[in-house]
Structures are given as C-alpha cells and as structure tokens.
Regions:
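N-terminal targeting sequences that direct proteins away from the cytosol to non-cytosolic compartments
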Residues: 1-63, 113, 118-120, 140-144, ...
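Conserved polar/disulfide-associated segments of primarily extracytoplasmic proteins
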Residues: 35-148, 155
Length: 183
C-alpha cells in the first residue's frame, strides 16, 4: 500500500500524486499558503453551531490539501483529504460515502447558515475518470451558492474536491482545470 503524500504547488499548478490528479489555474486565482490551509479546519469548525459536529471536525484525521479563490472573492475550490481508516476504507466506496454524506449534509450546511435548495448524488467526470459526487444548491443571505463535491478514494483515504460558485454554469469550466497525473 502506498503512503499518503501531500499535494505540491509549483507556479499555478497543484498536483497530488497519491490521488492521481492535478489542477492548473491562471493568475486570476490565488492559492492558499500552508498557514491558511491549517487555519481552515478551525475556521470551518467556527462556522458550526452544533457542538458535536464541531468536535468531530476538529478531531477528524482530515486536512485541507489545497484551496484557491478566484479574483471575485466568492468563487473557490478546495481539496480536503480524510483518513477513513483501514477498516472503513475497505468497506466504503465512493457511492456509499456520497449516499451517507447526503443524509447529513443539508443539516450541516444549515448549521453554517446555508439554506439548502437541493442536494443530489451525481456522477462527475473528474480528471479523466468518473467519480461519485454531490451537487448542492444553497442560498446564503439571499445569494445562490452552487457546490460540486467530487469524491476520489484511494486506499484508506478520500479526497473531496469542492468547487463553489454563485453561478452553476461556472462548475463545468472549473472541473476543466483538473487533469490526471501519472501515479
């Protein structure tokens, strides 16, 4: 079994050899640095009112591997890696993880003051392969937020790639920034 490796950033390119995908962005995007990535777990927990869910986030074996924000300040993408464990890793496939997540995601988003309009299981063509994902439409303070989460499972780890935009039409072009890397 191969060892988990963090993704690398070089110029406008992010690559994660472990999961076999990369992303190339132009200078209208800004990648978060290591300190910003570390602070994201705490910031995510701070948005949540539910103490149990907040504790779960802080205790989870998970981290942000990449985050980038478009110049508009609201369109963004991130890669969160989570250790689902050797036992669960053998049992859980992407489809099951998505189905289980959809059961709790609307409540989790509501705890972060997002009003979920729709949340559906989708197949995503991501970096040259089909993966299970979740397409969510929420509103925040009256504004639309479209999120596409793609699940990429390798061994006992899953990378969840989240694309977020106020315009649903932006999600497909954002997917196009990702490509397969040789592993």
């Amino acid at each position: 079994e191969k060892t988990l490796e963090l993704g690398t950033l070089s110029g406008g390119k992010y690559a994660n050899d472990y999961f076999g995908f990369g992303c190339e962005l132009d200078d209208q995007w800004t990648y978060a640095d290591e300190d910003q990535l570390l602070s994201m777990i705490q910031a995510t927990a701070d948005l949540i009112d539910d103490k149990n869910f907040k504790d779960d986030i802080l205790d989870a074996d998970m981290f942000y591997d990449m985050m980038a924000v478009y110049y508009d300040g609201v369109t963004s993408m991130n890669v969160v890696v989570q250790n689902i464990g050797a036992a669960y890793g053998a049992l859980l496939d992407e489809e099951t993880m998505v189905d289980e997540t959809i059961k709790v995601l609307p409540d989790q988003l509501a705890a972060a003051s997002m009003d979920v309009q729709s949340c559906e299981h989708v197949t995503v063509e991501f970096a040259g392969a089909d993966h299970d994902g979740i397409l969510t439409h929420s509103t925040v303070n009256g504004g639309d937020v479209y999120q596409l989460q793609t699940y990429v499972k390798v061994g006992k780890y899953v990378a969840v790639v989240t694309l977020s935009s106020p315009l649903e039409d932006n999600l497909d072009p954002m997917l196009g920034f990702f490509y397969a890397v040789q592993i």
